[in-house]
Amino acid sequence: MEFSVKNGSVEKQRTACLVVGVYEPRRLSAAAEQLDKLSEGYISTLLRRGDLEGKAGQTLLLHNVPNVPADRVLLVGCGKERELTERQYKQIIQKMVQAVSETGSMEVVCFLTELHVKGRTSYWNVRFAIEAIQESLYSYNDFKSIKPEVRREFRRVIFNVANRKDLADAERALEQGKAISTGVAFAKNVANCPPNVCNPAYLAELAKGLAAEYDNIRTTVIDEAEMAALGMNAYLAVSRGSQNPAYLSVIEYKNHPNPDAKPIVLVGKGLTFDSGGISIKPSDSMDEMKYDMGGAASVYGTMKALAEMKLPLNVIGVLAGCENMPDGNAYRPGDILTTMNGLTVEVLNTDAEGRLVLCDTLTYVERFEPELVIDMATLTGACMIALGAHNSGLMSTSNVLANDLLNAAEQADDKAWRLPLGEEYQEQLKSNFADLANIGGRLGGAITAGQLLSNFTKKYVWAHLDIAGTAWKSGVAKGATGRPVSLLSQFLINKANNQ
């Protein structure tokens, strides 16, 4: 898909399809008013007849509009004027995509980016439009022998901005929106890939692929022998039941003006399949446990977006690849594991494995002397119960970092909600036989999981994103979401802008 921006008048658009908005009740947007004057009241006459009310998401396709050089005019309902939210805006963009896809149009000139969206600028209108279009057009059919038949997709979208002074911001939105959308799609592709293909070795190859594609990326892959030498016993215990060995992939992106600047480290839990191990999961929906590597997928997608945006930062992405399977050699409830930093953990449930992989990985990244560390993990069902599928759960030992992430989440419309940490939750992790237990009981399960991780982050500023409820969708719309690539990308954009 080709995207571009311009500042032009609606009456001069010679294109396959011209898209303008109509507010509720039957109120023309500025661009639609210009078209109405040009067509001598043709559009307002149709509205008076009741052909379109203007409710958000309604569409009306017109052909041969008098005096209008465009082949088609698509009217899109935008709801009540001045009340358009980010969510509604993305929905009307997606309705535009659906309507245009059913025509033979190869090009679209879109004036919806001129609409007033609450609290947003032209930059955000253009960027959100690109992200919404790419979301609408995404499909994952790699393993279908007969590909679904689709109409020929339009190839080019031109976004109009009302003020010439906003063109520079719109161009920036164009480049960043394309990069972030690419990163989201990469994350989705990896997460949607079946676990008989996407195993820890596959994740490692993807990480190497980024290094082959970008000159300022270097990838190092650590195998189980190296992990054993480092004392990553908790990580390795989780992997013991699988015939697919674990791999820790370290993707180093260096583009800071000061090559010695401390890096931002992104850690992704990469359980390419989680059966639960000896504490085996119910069979219902176990297939969705291929998505237990959503954290690693989001780190991979973010590193892709980062490289495309060429942000002047030093960033390290870590993919903690592993499988959790039942086997005669699998770790057991009751085992006590000595972690890389020396703390011992009693295993009370082998299905609480992600935190064991992460605790050693979080210790490993100390060697980079990071500015900060953020880990992403589909960690707990408890977070899904608490926050549903809309907000990722955020925990942090730093108010500054937590606020920066929440700000980025709001900006990118990739929402997160902060949950507490504290010594009262640490009490729930007490064990009679080890320094820590790997679970803290039924109450506050998302928080006690984050609290456990905090024991391994004492040497740097740290935040944890529990994306168990946001990394994928179930049911008819089943598939990976690519979250929180947008949040992380915005966080990095903000870091680059403020240094």
Curated annotation (Swiss-Prot):
Keywords: Aminopeptidase, Cytoplasm, Hydrolase, Manganese, Metal-binding, Protease. Its main location: cytoplasm. One of its GO terms (molecular function) is metalloaminopeptidase activity. It is found in: Cytoplasm. One of its GO terms (biological process) is proteolysis. The keyword Protease applies. Its EC number is 3.4.11.1, 3.4.11.10. It holds the Pfam family Peptidase_M17. Binds 2 manganese ions per subunit. Mn(2+) 2 binds at K269, D274, D292, E353. It catalyses: Release of an N-terminal amino acid, Xaa-|-Yaa-, in which Xaa is preferably Leu, but may be other amino acids including Pro although not Arg or Lys, and Yaa may be Pro. Amino acid amides and methyl esters are also readily hydrolyzed, but rates on arylamides are exceedingly low; Release of an N-terminal amino acid, preferentially leucine, but not glutamic or aspartic acids. Coiled coil: none annotated. It comes from the Bacteria. The keyword Disulfide bond does not apply. Mn(2+) 1 binds at D274, D351, E353. Presumably involved in the processing and regular turnover of intracellular proteins. Catalyzes the removal of unsubstituted N-terminal amino acids from various peptides. This is Probable cytosol aminopeptidase. It comes from Actinobacillus pleuropneumoniae serotype 3 (strain JL03). The gene is pepA.
